[in-house]
Amino acid sequence: MRCEIAFGVDANYVKYAGIVMTSAVLQNAGEAIGFHLVCDGITEADCDRLEDFRRIFPSADIHIYDARARLDEIPFPKGIPRERINRSVFTRILMPEMVPQELTRILYLDADTLCVGQLSEMYAYDLGSAPLAAAREGDAARKAQRIGMRGTDYFNAGVMLIDL
């Protein structure tokens, strides 16, 4: 099963996604990997570097999706100062509609992660009827309370296995 990895980035973070992509390819040598970058504006130079990556690592397939128009339609949450959150975090909720419809699963990774091993076992994990798998935050109750969330089902959204 080919691993499909998705990122939500803007021009400030696309270079870091490139580092994650490199770690994924090197740790999974010989495996075909699809990379899906849902972007809030990246430069032509960024696109050129991604094309260079594709030439260096021919087992990697790269798809770039411009999410700016869709992000413009999402109302910014009340009570959260704009300087505290980058709107590219909302690309996660757009991914199911932006990636190709034939994809049934993606592994979402934040641009500040690294791949330190094989992805196949994690990617093949049986989610049962759950829509996604993610790690619980260690201090979930405190974080949930801080943002005014009811309950304590707070998870780390930086690494998510998502069934589409």
Name each model-derived stretch.
Residues 1-164:
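Glycosyltransferase catalytic domains, chiefly GT-A lineage
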